[in-house]
Amino acid sequence: MRQDKPGVLLVNLGTPDAPTTSAVKRYLKQFLSDKRVVDAPRWLWWPLLNFGILPIRSPRVSKLYASVWMDEGSPLMVYSQRQRNALAARLDMPVALGMSYGNPSLKSAIDSLMAEGVTRLIVLPLYPQFSCSTVAAVWDGITQVFAGYRSLPSVHFIRDYAQHPAYIAALKASVERSFAQHGKPDLLVTSFHGIPQRFADEGDDYPQRCYETFEALKASLGLGDDEAMLTFQSRFGREPWLMPYTDKTMESLPGKGVKHVQIMSPGFASDCLETLEEIDGENREIFLHAGGTRFEYIPALNDDEAHITMMLELVNQYR
């Protein structure tokens, strides 16, 4: 009789191995080559990526990574490893960390779990809100790895957790800590990573999941419609993305009398370039330059105890 041995695979997007041009170029090439991320025809996208985008963006992006790099490494990697370690300490089963792009790869993570005899795999993509460009890419990556296996484990794939009570409670606690430390702002802004509007039009329910998180958090905090808003960040390319845009919102708020904002990015399980540099750096500068007076960034949940407890609850559903 086959022994039942569960194991957990935590997955996040990924990060360059170092804040150098060569490492960033290698990472961006893998990331931007995924059709889930950029679905342009390959004959058009390949030369544009390799002869235009990568040579131009890699040196600039490497400097941005260097500005947020921690002593232990990339913030996303540091916090993801801490999450894995904390979860493993509270579970009596193997826990591995894999990245969709870069290292540790999904293959290395899955191989390590299979080598430990795992027969039932619990996959937790660390994306609270489903999107075809993130969670579906994890699904693709896992199936590609298992294409090389003769035997497969049972797989429990956690699609997302946008409204999970423990997730909302963890977000609420982080906002309340910020309010207690800095005072209640004129406006709480929740900034989610954007996707092309076309993806949503074609069936990706990501925007709905973001709004469901936002509404649940707003209700838990007892905030009115004029005290919190949702925006979308990190647009790339020329086609329309989900709106309102975070940077344009930060530019316009002071003119509407909003002088004090606190901003968080609930869609990021770990702080990374998009939160530390884009939100706490670029958007802070935009808001203050436009006439704002106070801007506070509320960190991602990272390895906060409430975040680990949430992960534990999600995993325990499938033990």
UniProtKB/Swiss-Prot annotation:
UniProt keyword list: Cytoplasm, Heme biosynthesis, Iron, Lyase, Metal-binding, Porphyrin biosynthesis
GO MF, any single term: ferrochelatase activity
GO process terms (BP): heme biosynthetic process
Domain of life: Bacteria
EC number: 4.98.1.1
Record flagged with keyword tRNA processing: no
Catalytic activity: heme b + 2 H(+) = protoporphyrin IX + Fe(2+)
Pfam family, one: Ferrochelatase
Entry keyword annotation includes Lyase: yes
Compartments it resides in: Cytoplasm
Database matches in Gene3D superfamilies: 3.40.50.1400
Pathway annotation from the record: Porphyrin-containing compound metabolism; protoheme biosynthesis; protoheme from protoporphyrin-IX: step 1/1
Disulfide bonds: none
Alphabetical list of SUPFAM superfamilies matching this protein: Chelatase
Matches recorded under InterPro entries: Ferrochelatase (IPR001015), Ferrochelatase_AS (IPR019772), Ferrochelatase_C (IPR033644), Ferrochelatase_N (IPR033659)
GO cellular component, one term: cytoplasm
Residue sites binding Fe cation per the record: 193, 274
Similarity comment: family membership: Belongs to the ferrochelatase family.
Family annotation (PANTHER family): FERROCHELATASE, FERROCHELATASE, MITOCHONDRIAL
Role description: Catalyzes the ferrous insertion into protoporphyrin IX.
Matches recorded under NCBIfam families: hemH (TIGR00109)
Protein name: Ferrochelatase
Biological source species: Erwinia tasmaniensis (strain DSM 17950 / CFBP 7177 / CIP 109463 / NCPPB 4357 / Et1/99)
Gene (UniProt): hemH
